[in-house]
Regions:
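Alpha/beta-hydrolase-fold enzymes
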Residues: 129-217
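Short beta-strand element of the alpha/beta-hydrolase
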Residues: 53-61
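An N-terminal hydrophobic leader/cap segment in hydrolases
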Residues: 1-36, 40-48
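Short beta-strand/loop motif that positions the catalytic acidic residue
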Residues: 239
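Conserved alpha/beta-hydrolase
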Residues: 73-97
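Active-site nucleophile elbow and catalytic-triad environment of alpha/beta-hydrolase enzymes
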Residues: 213-236
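Catalytic nucleophile-loop/oxyanion-hole region of alpha/beta-hydrolase
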Residues: 62-68, 92-122
Length: 239
């Protein structure tokens, strides 16, 4: 589908959202574009500096959302890069069952829509940045890419891409034993960062954090791990 950030469907409470997550507001030399895709399913936000040297698409991690990437957004803007972010299905402000996913191709399909939006409305070259699951989505997009079409990204930058999670063998075994009668489990907030204040914010202050994790994500992860292991060698440079 053709995804376009639609100014006719603004994000309710956007100013409060930006303040709460300490994201850059619009200024005289910084344009902020925010809205939903045409199907109203996905929230998209873009920051464009007065002089732009290219556009970065940021793909967030599992159970993350745009609001948690303020430091990265500001760093990219300081480099005169336009930043385009979106909340994946079931994450942040986007619609869908919280964090439920049957196949990573659902995330890749939405990424393709965002790429089309960037190519139509923002300056090139185009760069991809992916954190954890977001890194996996960018890799899957790369290995599934049709070589007849020019590859859209000038660079790929992956931050701890999700390729084989810690404790995966046990998680996988438990999933296949219980998937027919356990559809979600209580979320355990792990020490995923050295920043204790950030971890405390996730646990007790961020209203967009899910408290339960759908078990279907394990099945989707299992499919992805198998696909990655069996994929052909690719010489594209990744940073």
């Amino acid at each position: 589908s053709d995804a376009v950030a639609n100014p006719d469907t603004p994000i309710e409470g956007l100013a409060d959202y930006l303040r709460f997550y300490q994201l850059p507001p619009a200024t005289h030399n910084l344009q902020l574009v925010a809205g939903t895709t045409d199907d109203h399913a996905t929230v998209v936000m873009g920051w464009r500096p007065a002089i732009s040297r290219g556009t970065v698409i940021v793909v967030h991690g599992y159970m993350d959302h745009i609001g948690l990437y303020g430091h990265l957004i500001r760093d990219l803007l300081s480099r005169q890069l336009t930043v385009l972010c979106f909340d994946a299905k079931g994450h942040g402000l986007s619609s869908g069952v919280p964090c439920s996913i049957s196949h990573f191709s659902e995330y890749v399909d939405r990424l393709k829509d965002i790429i089309a939006m960037a190519q139509a409305h923002f300056e090139g070259p185009l760069h991809g940045v992916g954190q954890s699951m977001g890194g996996a989505v960018l890799i899957k997009h790369l290995i599934n890419h049709n070589i007849v079409i020019p590859y859209p990204f000038a660079t790929l930058n992956l931050l701890a891409p999700l390729l084989h999670p810690w404790g995966w063998t046990q998680s996988r075994r438990l999933y296949y034993l219980s998937r027919w009668f356990i559809k979600s489990i209580k979320r355990v907030f792990r020490a995923s960062s050295w920043d204790k204040d950030f971890l405390g914010f996730l646990r007790s202050q961020d209203p967009l954090q899910p408290t339960r994790v759908p078990t279907d994500c394990v099945g989707a992860m299992d499919q992805w791990i198998l696909e990655f292991k069996n994929s052909d060698e690719n010489n594209y440079p990744i940073h």
